[in-house]
Amino acid sequence: KNFGLYRERTGALIVCASDAEKLVDIRSQLASIARNLWSTPPAHGAAVVAQILGDEELKALWLDELEGMRLRVASLRRGLVEALAPHGLSERFAHVAEQRGMFSYTGLSPLQVQRLREEFSVYMVGSGRANVAGLDASRLDQLADAIARVCVN
């Protein structure tokens, strides 16, 4: 997803109904509304992308920003693995430096992820998938310490 365009008709709706029959009726109405939205998707995002890719100066700026983000994420990946080295965990997490993209599968267990959340306020999904792009380079040592504590103990 190289063009992340947010606030474009996204969201969630949660419905609580007093009984199953009402829930079926509500679901039917919501499905009808959703079909109309899906049948006519917004064109704004496509127009923005077309304008950027159609203008050499804008395209060059976008490519430069994209490369900057790619390099930043790669640096964060390497930095985390390096920060884990003093804990004897660089081999165990070497795959993190080799992966690509904004997210990484850490290999942490659901219990380790829970401990990171509860004991160190480190948040990721239960599968161990982490948002590398959201890391702060100045806090990689702190993160490595927390990971080491849940992996060793």
Feature roles, as predicted:
Residues 27-46, 52-81:
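Structural signature of PLP-dependent enzymes
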Residues 42-43, 95-98, 124:
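A structural signal for short secondary-structure junctions
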Residues 1-25:
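Active-site PLP attachment segment
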